[in-house]
Every structure is written in structure tokens, then in C-alpha cells.
């Protein structure tokens, strides 16, 4: 009954009006809510979700956001436990504050991108693009701090041991070659980065062919019994069967039955295919 109540809350509400605890952020840049017991979402200026999972022995920070404000201090307001930091992939909106932490776990295929996006000008440009406007410049925004972090490669099956919680890496190439999801099997949660957003971007220059992403979705669809909730990098939580709509969406692109429509953002032009709840923006030349 408790799990059903949590599910109902998650799917009827956004992160910003859940009944979980919220706290005053030390920076006006962030909004912070405890969306499940000892699972915090740090909303990075309404552009991306950063997750903090707190175990009995240590805590796991999943992604670091745009790097536009003092994330380290924000995290330390939530927990004093030893901190592990992992990137779901190497894009600047997910790895932009890596420079604030000493060690970053990331798939080897994305580590060079994560390092490159931590240049101060990269962080500034990304925030401006994502927010669609000039970004305010408080004292803690866009420090000209270079990155000296150590990147440590993780592979499929790697386990982050937090004490009472064990978070498993699942390789999910598609949005980037080194994308990963993070499975909290004990709590039946999947932290999915940009793999399972409402609209998944598969048209960027470093995206894998769509056929590779299709295999990723098939892999996850075979593991639906291991998680009930998807906690994505953008937007609100989704039920696990959202992945089934994604499978059908991509299948319809690959078999040329989808009636797509033009799609354009600051990142470029694409075609958009929709199926059920899912949408995929893709490059017709990269199937």
C-alpha cells in the first residue's frame, strides 16, 4: 500500500509539489525536494534534475548539472556522508559542475566530453542555451575555475555500495556512446539520465545510430521487473512501462512506418517521431 501511495503521488504531481520534504537552498539557483525517503532531487534552475541518494555509509550524487552555481555547498547542506559522484553521460547539463568535485565516475566513452564541457565558457554557453535567455551572474556563478577532477571509468554491472543501498551501472548507449543508467534494485528505482526523457534526443553529432539505441531499449524492457520508477534527467518520474512506448516508437522509425514531423531546437534540426507517451528526435541519416 505504501508503494502504491508513493506511485500515485509521483505520477499526479511534479517534483515541485510532492509531499516530500523541501529545504531552503543556499543558492537561489537550485530548488531542492526529497522526492522519496533519502532521495533528493536538486533542480538546476529548471533545466536538469540532479539526484542525491543517501545510504547508511555514503551518498551518491547522480549528475552535477550545468556548473553555474555552488553545487558542492548545496549537497553538503543535505548530507555530510562520504560522497560518490557519477555522471550518467558527458553532456554539459549533466556534467557541468564536475570541476567542483575531486573524483567523477563516468563511462570511458564520455569522459573526454565531460572534461571539455567543464571549461568556464562551455558552462556559460550551455546554461544560456538551455534556459533560453541571458543568465544572471551572482557571485557564485561561472567561477573561472578549471577542472582538476579525476575521472574513473565504470562499466556495465559496476556497483556503488552506499551501505544499505547498492546502485548498479547499466550501460545504455544511444543519447551518447557512454550513457549509463543507475539501478537501485532494492528500492526499484532507475535513474535514467537522458535515456528516458519524454522526448529523447538522438540527433546530436555524438549520438549512436538509432539501431544501437533500440538495442538499449530492448535490454531495459527485459529488466522491467527490477524497477517500478524511472527518474529521468529532465522532467518528472515515469512508470517503467514508458520504456515499452519508447521501444515501439523507435521500431516505427527503423521500419519506416512512423509519420514524423520537423523538430528544431538550439541544438539543431531533426525529425520527431511519437508513440504513446514517448517521443524521439532523430537524424534520418543516422539510423
Residue ranges and their predicted role:
Residues 22-23, 27-37, 109-170, 185-186, ...:
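Metallo-beta-lactamase
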Residues 62-64, 83-93, 105-108, 171-174, ...:
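Active-site neighborhood of phospho(di)ester-bond hydrolases with catalytic His/Asp-centered motifs
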Residues 21-22, 215-287:
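Accessory terminal helices/loops
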Residues 49, 67-70, 90-96, 111-113, ...:
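Active-site environment of divalent metal-dependent phosphoester hydrolases
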Residues 28-77, 181-197:
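Conserved beta-strand hairpin/beta-sheet module of binuclear metal-dependent hydrolase folds
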Residues 1-22:
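Bacterial Sec-dependent N-terminal signal peptides
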Residues 68-161, 198, 248-260:
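Active-site HxH/HxHxD metal-binding segment of metal-dependent hydrolases
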Residues 170-206, 210-214, 218:
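Active-site-proximal loop/helix segments of hydrolase catalytic cores
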Amino acid at each position: 500500500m505504501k508503494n502504491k501511495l508513493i506511485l500515485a503521488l509521483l505520477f499526479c504531481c511534479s517534483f515541485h509539489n510532492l509531499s516530500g520534504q523541501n529545504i531552503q537552498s543556499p543558492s537561489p539557483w537550485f530548488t531542492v525536494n526529497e522526492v522519496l525517503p533519502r532521495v533528493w532531487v536538486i533542480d538546476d534552475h529548471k533545466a536538469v534534475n540532479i539526484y542525491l541518494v543517501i545510504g547508511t555509509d555514503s551518498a551518491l550524487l547522480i549528475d552535477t548539472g550545468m556548473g553555474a552555481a555552488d553545487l558542492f555547498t548545496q549537497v553538503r547542506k543535505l548530507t555530510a556522508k562520504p560522497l560518490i559522484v557519477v555522471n550518467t553521460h558527458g553532456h554539459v547539463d549533466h556534467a557541468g559542475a564536475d570541476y567542483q568535485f575531486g573524483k567523477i565516475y563516468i563511462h570511458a566513452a564520455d569522459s573526454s566530453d565531460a572534461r571539455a564541457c567543464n571549461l568556464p565558457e562551455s558552462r556559460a554557453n550551455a546554461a544560456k542555451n538551455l534556459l533560453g535567455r541571458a543568465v544572471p551572474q551572482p557571485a557564485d556563478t561561472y567561477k573561472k575555475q578549471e577542472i582538476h577532477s579525476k575521472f574513473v571509468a565504470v562499466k556495465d554491472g559496476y556497483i556503488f555500495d552506499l551501505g544499505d543501498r547498492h546502485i548498479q551501472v547499466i550501460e545504455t548507449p544511444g543519447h551518447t556512446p557512454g550513457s549509463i543508467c543507475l539501478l537501485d534494485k532494492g528500492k526499484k528505482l532507475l535513474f535514467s539520465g537522458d535515456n528516458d526523457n519524454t522526448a529523447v534526443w538522438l540527433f546530436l553529432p555524438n549520438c549512436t545510430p538509432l539501431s544501437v539505441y533500440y538495442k538499449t531499449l530492448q535490454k531495459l524492457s527485459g529488466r522491467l521487473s527490477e524497477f517500478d520508477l524511472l527518474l529521468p534527467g529532465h522532467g518528472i518520474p515515469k512508470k517503467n512501462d514508458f520504456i515499452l512506448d519508447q521501444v515501439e516508437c523507435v521500431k516505427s522509425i527503423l521500419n519506416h512506418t512512423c509519420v514524423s514531423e520537423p523538430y528544431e531546437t538550439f541544438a539543431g534540426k531533426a525529425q520527431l517521431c511519437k508513440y504513446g507517451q514517448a517521443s524521439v528526435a532523430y537524424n534520418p541519416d543516422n539510423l
